[in-house]
Curated annotation (Swiss-Prot):
This protein promotes the GTP-dependent binding of aminoacyl-tRNA to the A-site of ribosomes during protein biosynthesis. The gene is eft-1. Belongs to the TRAFAC class translation factor GTPase superfamily. Classic translation factor GTPase family. EF-Tu/EF-1A subfamily. Residues 153-156 are annotated as: G4. This is Elongation factor 1-alpha 1. Its main location: cytoplasm. Residues 194-196 are annotated as: G5.
Amino acid sequence: MGKEKTHINIVVIGHVDSGKSTTTGHLIYKCGGIDKRTIEKFEKEAQEMGKGSFKYAWVLDKLKAERERGITIDIALWKFETAKFYVTIIDAPGHRDFIKKMITGTSQADCAVLVVACGTGEFEAGISKNGQTREHALLAQTLGVKQMIVACNKMDSTEPPFSEKRFEEIITEVKSFIKKIGYNPATIPFVPISGFNGDNMLEPSANMSWYKGWSVERKEGNASGKTLLEALDCIIPPQRPTDRPLRLPLQDVYKIGGIGTVPVGRVETGVIKPGMVVTFAPQNVTTEVKSVEMHHESLPEAQPGDNVGFNVKNVSVKDIRRGSVCSDSKNDPAKESKSFTAQVIVMNHPGQIGAGYTPVLDCHTAHIACKFAELKEKVDRRTGKKVEDLPKFLKSGDAGIVELIPTKPLCVEAFTDYAPLGRFAVRDMRQTVAVGVIKGVTKDDGSGGKVTKSAAKKK
């Protein structure tokens, strides 16, 4: 086998009819984990239902339906390979909880693939004031997705088909709006494709001989190519934050007979290993780690990205819970957040948000109501510059700096210190009404917590 390929995560974004599903389906279909038998079964069903023209999207729809019914489908189905990487598609929007998932993200996307439809009138609809193209791109930027690829889809339905003029017109427009959001167009490949016919997806298309290819300039090295697959192959792989202090938000806490208390979660930053003395916030409980396991094998050390279970001494299941954060007691231990300041972008709130509003925040694995105690300023969401001091309220489309107070103990961090613990979704009326990035946190001083005997010995 040789060295395993690097794993990267992508998120596919764009307006509802841009052809995200077809494009994604095509990649999975041609380079991915779906076995031929499953594909043939899907194709036959698609034909029978008169959806033959829709086969790639159909593949994706089948996968989505199974995923939504809670059938844990083989996650390999959402993976495909490039020459250098194993690529996992974290999620494609269209899912009601897409935004929430992207924020509380079980995994941070390394790159966003923005799909725009080039058909006459379609591009304009997606990029208009209420189109999702800008919203998704802004979201990706706000949540720290640093890299982007733009796939100009449906080139087969421009007038005339495969029109160079239309492609140029569209990339000029896209460059202008992504620049406003904060992306540098020089670092972004723009690829004209047909997700359905396969033009420029895996092989250069004969239909667009005018297209000389994409090229990008960036400090990590320049790159160029012709196809979407090559653009994906040029993503800069993520640096794992092993050098940061430990942060591990708990997904669950189990009580296992004969072993004891086993918290489970994903290491976001730092490392965790047996013998380490850890502190759980906001409960302020300190104890020793006995063992660390992943996939039923014990590990000498777990790193960022690893989903692990670990056994702790003399801590009851009542002491800690989902949403608690495990940290190294000797290296910037996590503490309870008394209040925090955040920049929020209001997205689809039907009314307006004023001081006193108390919705539920989803931040890492925590799910806790927080009160908007004070609206400090209204800012221009593109530049971050202040527009107004102490606004009375914020409505859809506004961005502001706000002071939030949790209604129950909570542990969050500033985005610049620990990114995965510093972004949140504001949920109300069963939808995401705002997203936020935490600027600063007022922490409890952390005195008077519970310390187990084994932890005290090691102090």
